[in-house]
C-alpha cells in the first residue's frame, strides 16, 4: 500500500497565496458570474476541519437555485450594505477601526512604515487606505509568492491583532454568501495564526475542482 503524496511546501504556500487573493477579491468587490460558478463547483476534501466546513458553506452559498444575474445583482447590493455603506457598512474592514476605534489612526501609520520598508507602493487605482483588509491580504499573497521571510512579521504585526475578529463580524451578517465568506476568513486566519506561531508546515484544506 502506498500513501497519497502530500503537497510540497511550495504547493502549500501557493495555495495559501491563492486563498489570500481570493479573500481579497471577494472583500473588495462582488464576484462575477465566472467566479461564482467556480466557487459553486468546488469539491472540498471533507477532513472534519473547520476550514473544510467553511469552504463547503461558501460553495453552497455561491450555488443556490437563484438565476445567476439576479444573484449577482443581489450580492452587489449586499456587498455595499455589509462592507461599504453610505457612511460605513455593517462591517468596517480597516485595521485602524478595529485596533484604534477610528479610521486613519496609528495602525495605518505603522502599516505604511512597514510597507515602505518592504518596498510596497500604494496603487493609484484605489481610494481605500492601505489598512483595508483586502489590501493586507494582497500583501500577504505577494510576500508568499516571493518566499519572503517577512511573512510572519507582517502577519503578526498587521493581521493577527484584528483580522479574525473582523471576519467573525462579517460572519454574522444576514446574507448567506457574505456570512460564509466571513466565517471562512476567520477560520483561515486561525489557521495562519497557528502556522506563524509554530513556524511549521501546516497545510490549508485542499480544494479540488470538479
Functional labels for PLM-detected ranges:
Residues 1-210:
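Surface/interface-facing alpha-helical segments and adjacent flexible terminal/loop regions used
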